[in-house]
Amino acid sequence: RSLLNVLQEEKASRYAGGIYHKTQIELTYNSNHMEGSRLTHEQTRYIFETNTIGVENEVLNVDDVIETANHFRCIDLLIDKAKTALSEKLIKELHFILKTGTSDARKDWFAVGDYKKLPNEVGGRDTALPEEVSEQMRALLAKYNAKKSKTFKDILDFHVCFERIHPFQDGNG
């Protein structure tokens, strides 16, 4: 059995404690943490396992909770489409799922499920200008998809390039 088979089987059965369970919690916690979420690892786990929030004497950002729940759905979609070539359409669909229902979705200038409209930077580093994003993403995807089998280094290189382009206003992590 491949890792993908195990992930698909555990996803279908909602098996607790396996690689699917751990992947959902670890990827969601770490990705959201990089994007500034203040949810703890334990809160992320609790949301995944129970679809509820149990908090006393603590203020939570609603967007953190929404994006956490949405991130679980993004991972499920990636497992479902794992054998499909990575595309702009899929990347935009993931962004749409991630940001739906957040306060960003109510901003006129924020393009949920589409590339950024305004320039942005990451850690003081300039990113691709909005008018450059589409072309740079197409080039990145063409280079990545041209590889017959992807190594771990190929995946890391793709992610570094993706982060340098930073195609979305927010939610690029």
Regions found by a protein language model. Give the residues of each.
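FIC/Doc superfamily catalytic core
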Residues: 1-172
